[in-house]
A protein has these predicted regions:
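A generic secondary-structure signal
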Residues: 39, 43, 47, 75-78, ...
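Catalytic cores of large soluble enzymes that bind and process phosphate-bearing ligands
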Residues: 29-32, 36, 47, 64, ...
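Acidic/glycine-enriched edge-of-secondary-structure segments
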Residues: 25-32, 128-133, 254-270
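N-terminal active-site segment of His-dependent metallophosphoesterases
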Residues: 1-69
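Short glycine/proline-enriched loop/turn "hinge" motifs that connect secondary-structure elements
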Residues: 44, 149-151, 246
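His/Asp/Glu-rich metal-coordinating catalytic cores
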Residues: 51, 62-242
Length: 282
């Protein structure tokens, strides 16, 4: 059994910092978040995954262009044609989006309630997926204590949009600790909100709870450097057996440090920057 864990799509969120450059690839910049998500859906179809989990922030705050929502519906429709269900919750950005309340999603998409945590059961696979959506952007309560108890003998997946302890640079929405997640007794926590990928524990042993942020699909500015994407998770019965990184970003941000001497002029600086860039792309 395998599934995709994604989060923080931020569809149609603008890529910032390149508008001052006339030769920037304007069309690629405009469609980057969409193109990354199309690549992810392509992988889901090629891999014939059993389902997809999206842990919040599909949309980008108060973005009001309904074409964004219609695009998302079309991609969900592609998965529906392949009989791939999607389990998603709404995060802080979705909670303030008009599209969250106004658009009707295909019947293969299952959305967690914002009233209380609930469970979607895939009986044929003995999988229980637990989660709760944000009702409002500033959701500062710890949701974990009210998540359902794990189903004995099944693979239990918790879906949560949270800052988690140790991520002070992110708004402290739905705060919780690693120990609280571990104590819940789920085998896998599919988290969202933090845009950097992390998988805990780093050196996993059999039976340990996996706590994972996939990061966002597409870096949007220089503070979101390096490869971006999602996670392909494989399980056998009630045990997580493998986690594969899926790089789907179509543009990548990277800061390069170039050493210059006191006698170097602009031409030397440009040559050094060029060599550093060639080394990065090699």
């Amino acid at each position: 059994m395998k599934f995709i864990h994604a989060a923080d799509l931020h569809l149609d969120s603008p890529l910032r910092g390149l508008s001052a450059y006339s030769d920037a690839p304007a069309e690629q910049l405009r469609t980057a978040t969409r193109d990354a998500f199309v690549k992810l859906v392509d992988i889901a179809l090629d891999e014939a995954v059993d389902f997809m989990v999206i842990a919040g922030d599909i949309y980008d705050g108060d973005w009001k262009d309904f074409n964004t929502g219609l695009f998302f519906i079309r991609q969900m429709g592609r998965l529906r044609q392949a009989s791939i269900p999607v389990y998603l919750l709404y995060g802080n950005h979705d909670a303030e989006s008009d599209m969250t309340r106004s658009l009707t999603l295909p019947d293969n998409v299952h959305v967690f309630s914002s009233r209380k945590a609930e469970t979607f059961a895939i009986e044929s696979l003995k999988i229980a997926i637990h989660g709760r959506s944000f009702k409002q952007k500033a959701t500062t309560e710890n949701m974990v204590p009210n998540y359902p108890e794990p189903v004995p003998g099944w693979l239990n997946i918790g879906v949560l949009h949270t800052a988690l302890e140790g991520n002070a640079e992110h708004a402290t929405y739905a705060p919780c600790t690693v120990s609280e997640l571990e104590a819940k007794g789920y085998q896998y926590w599919a988290l969202g909100h933090v845009h950097e990928r992390s998988i805990l524990p780093e050196h996993r042993q059999a039976g340990q709870t996996v706590i994972a942020f996939p990061g966002n699909l597409q870096g949007r500015h220089i503070r979101e450097q390096g490869a971006r994407g999602a996670l392909l998770v494989t399980a056998q019965a009630d045990e997580i057996t493998d986690i594969q990184l899926l790089e789907v970003d179509v543009l990548r941000w990277q800061q390069l440090d170039v050493e210059l001497g006191p006698d170097d002029d602009m031409a030397s600086a440009l040559q050094a920057a060029g060599r550093a860039l060639e080394h990065l792309l090699a």
